[in-house]
Amino acid sequence: MDNTLKHLAIIMDGNGRWAKLKNKARAYGHKKGVKTLKDITIWCANHKLECLTLYAFSTENWKRPKSEVDFLMKMLKKYLKDERSTYLNNNIRFRAIGDLEGFSKELRDTILQLENDTRHFKDFTQVLALNYGSKNELSRAFKSLLESPPSHINLLESLENEISNRLDTHDLPEVDLLLRTGGEMRLSNFLLWQSSYAELFFTPILWPDFTPKDLENIISDFYKRVRKFGELKC
């Protein structure tokens, strides 16, 4: 199998702790985190990656205080509108994954509009995981499979493909490298199916402090690793 880094996935963790260290409100950390998101996205677009998936809002994030959730929704809508030119000028295709029905119609329309405006770009895709959780995604895939089962008899042999084709990421490559900032060492229900053979990297750097140079160093480490994909390699 190909060892080239095509799909990078990032759990952007540490905005709140970063703001606390600065004696600022959590919203301040989220705003700085958006700038990091933009910088990392443009770097990836310019360095021949095929796909960057960013964990922006999880199905569990609704449990946060309503004031913070409301702020995040407003910030997301503003980002998608304000950065439209960034996507167009850098030939970036935008995709959203997750249970978008959980959002307001206005926000869903904003998401769909940017997807539509950038759908013709082929070289690089930025994916925002929004109201996303792997358990939710797999549940929706299984529900789809039960509601419209394939007609062929040999289901067990093709079950993996049937599930993959019903995931939000059906048109994207498998994850090669999954990175989490902020020091925590868990996957937090993120791309569990798609990361079955991904290399994992955990850095203590808080997301607002994370730079393209930090990413370069991590990618350099990625290419030093031997990816076996279950095979024996000497």
UniProtKB/Swiss-Prot annotation:
Q: How is the cofactor bound?
A: Binds 2 magnesium ions per subunit.
Q: Is Metal-binding given among the entry's keywords?
A: yes
According to the UniProt entry, its GO molecular function terms are:
ditrans,polycis-undecaprenyl-diphosphate synthase [(2E,6E)-farnesyl-diphosphate specific] activity; magnesium ion binding
PROSITE patterns hit by this protein: UPP_SYNTHASE
EC numbers: 2.5.1.-
Query: What SUPFAM superfamilies does UniProt report for this protein, alphabetically?
Result: Undecaprenyl diphosphate synthase
Residues of the active site are 13, 61
Kindly state a single biological-process term from the GO annotations of this entry: polyprenol biosynthetic process
PANTHER family named among the record's database cross-references: DEHYDRODOLICHYL DIPHOSPHATE SYNTHASE 2, DEHYDRODOLICHYL DIPHOSPHATE SYNTHASE FAMILY MEMBER
Q: Which family does it belong to?
A: Belongs to the UPP synthase family.
Function comment: Catalyzes the condensation of isopentenyl diphosphate (IPP) with allylic pyrophosphates generating different type of terpenoids.
Kindly provide the name given to this protein in its UniProt entry.
Isoprenyl transferase
What's the source species for this entry? Helicobacter pylori (strain ATCC 700392 / 26695)
The gene for this chain is: uppS
